[in-house]
Amino acid sequence: MTTNYIFVTGGVVSSLGKGIAAASLAAILEARGLNVTIMKLDPYINVDPGTMSPIQHGEVFVTEDGAETDLDLGHYERFIRTKMSRRNNFTTGRIYSDVLRKERRGDYLGATVQVIPHITNAIKERVLEGGEGHDVVLVEIGGTVGDIESLPFLEAIRQLAVDIGREHALFMHLTLVPYLAAAGEVKTKPTQHSVKELLSIGIQPDILICRSDRAVPANERAKIALFCNVPEKAVISMKDVDSIYKIPGLLKSQGLDDYICKRFSLNCPEANLSEWEQVIYEEANPAGEVTIGMVGKYIELPDAYKSVIEALKHGGLKNRVTVNIKLIDSQDVETRGVEILKDLDAILIPGGFGYRGVEGKIATARYARENNIPYLGICLGMQVALIEFARNVAGMDNANSTEFVPDCKYPVVALITEWRDEDGNVEVRNEKSDLGGTMRLGAQQCQLSDDSLVRQLYGASTIVERHRHRYEVNNMLLKQIEAAGLRVAGRSGDAQLVEIIEVPNHPWFVACQFHPEFTSTPRDGHPLFAGFVKAANEHQKRQAK
């Protein structure tokens, strides 16, 4: 089987939406029966985004096999059925780390190690490895054409197109076509200059995706085609839309998938986008709305919680309600009190690290428990719920996590001292160990209690969810907390670790150690988020009586 590659680049400015465009195109090709995957190549020198600030980089998306990756991989999984893995995302730092390790071992037999060919060859090898077994692979190059750090990746894909043959390689370039109100027209010159920059590197784009706040007129697309040496039918207008799930239909309506299939000589049926049409219909025709408060510490950048926000929206689709998300800084809860949590239909505390704002999260969990407000805690959101219950119900004054107070009297949450690395080897860590790559990561099995709410929601006794954490419930103190009324609703496959807790005699109080947001999709939703949004809707109705 021959694998075909579409290399996706961006020009003029960043944040044009390369990831959404690539994912949308992949969704159309998948709907034509093709086996599709997507890769993201990031030009920063960090080995992975695992230790990067969420406020700078956005969320870290965790794959089934435990890779800490760029948030664009979350978009990919929400748009196509193919599961991402560590092969789908790598960085400059990872490439240099691999090459330097080989150099130290003597693998290069004394050769002078250079960007070309050693770095570019390493990039090409990873791209080819990631594409094995697929009909079409979309490869998104992070950053903007012209950035110095992107040059090795651009050179690598230029070479790769020659290596595999131009009949199996396409270059798709996203570019900004701004509208100038003073002139009353869109301007194509930035696109021309962006393509000129690509040509100077040796890459002639085959497809141009024109990003604008409005549809780019046919005469302007013809002008772009003429000056950029691209067929008119390969100049695609991608205007702003009110829902990203409309983009597959927008691209298909302009024949982008037909053009690609003809270029690759792929004989496949027309794309059936009925599932996406259903998503768009549900999104546009809600029967009501709810307001859910999300209390976190990185709220100045909503992308830090991208998958959670999307999963809440998916939960809304499954309940035919619009979910309005109110982002609340947990430090504001500390300084202004729980009064700012009033008038919410439900409360969610997502994952996070560090002590800043944690007491505000603990106060939030108490407010939700005592006032019968639906609560969903994720990762740290479960740990603060446990701490709150231990302090205020189980009589364990000043209970805490050793992450925040190492010598506390009741360490109800403690460090995981053993975990398996990406090769399956058991590693031992302590508080002084490196932060990068030293967490419980990836898909883990969980056994659900028969009498639990989550057992009803999932409709199964065993589930698999993705993890990203260093701290866990301390089993040594668990019996006292359970005796006070807390229910352990889910345990790890070996029954050693607490994965889910519930508060009985509460309308809906569920907290999990894993990250359910990573497996939620617009077409299928997720049982926890669907149940949570339903509980929010029911709470709203109770309050209205």
From Swiss-Prot:
Pathway: Pyrimidine metabolism; CTP biosynthesis via de novo pathway; CTP from UDP: step 2/2. ATP binds at residues 15-20, 72, 239-241. L-glutamine binds at residues 352, 380-383, 403, 470. Mg(2+) binds at residues 72, 140. The keyword Transmembrane does not apply. GO terms for molecular function: ATP binding; CTP synthase activity; glutaminase activity; identical protein binding; metal ion binding. UTP binds at residues 14, 187-192, 223. The keyword Magnesium applies. InterPro entries: Class_I_gatase-like (IPR029062), CTP_synthase (IPR004468), CTP_synthase_N (IPR017456), GATASE (IPR017926), GATase1_CTP_Synthase (IPR033828), P-loop_NTPase (IPR027417). Residues 291-542 form the Glutamine amidotransferase type-1 domain. Allosterically activated by GTP, when glutamine is the substrate; GTP has no effect on the reaction when ammonia is the substrate. The allosteric effector GTP functions by stabilizing the protein conformation that binds the tetrahedral intermediate(s) formed during glutamine hydrolysis. Inhibited by the product CTP, via allosteric rather than competitive inhibition. Keywords: ATP-binding, Glutamine amidotransferase, Ligase, Magnesium, Metal-binding, Nucleotide-binding, Pyrimidine biosynthesis. Gene3D superfamilies: 3.40.50.880, P-loop containing nucleotide triphosphate hydrolases. GO terms for cellular component: cytosol. CTP binds at residues 14, 147-149, 187-192, 223. Residues 1-266 are annotated as: Amidoligase domain. It comes from the Bacteria. Its EC number is 6.3.4.2. It catalyses: UTP + L-glutamine + ATP + H2O = CTP + L-glutamate + ADP + phosphate + 2 H(+); L-glutamine + H2O = L-glutamate + NH4(+); UTP + NH4(+) + ATP = CTP + ADP + phosphate + 2 H(+). GO terms for biological process: 'de novo' CTP biosynthetic process; pyrimidine nucleobase biosynthetic process. Pfam families: CTP_synth_N, GATase. Belongs to the CTP synthase family. Homotetramer. CTPSs have evolved a hybrid strategy for distinguishing between UTP and CTP. The overlapping regions of the product feedback inhibitory and substrate sites recognize a common feature in both compounds, the triphosphate moiety. To differentiate isosteric substrate and product pyrimidine rings, an additional pocket far from the expected kinase/ligase catalytic site, specifically recognizes the cytosine and ribose portions of the product inhibitor. This is CTP synthase. It comes from Salmonella newport (strain SL254).
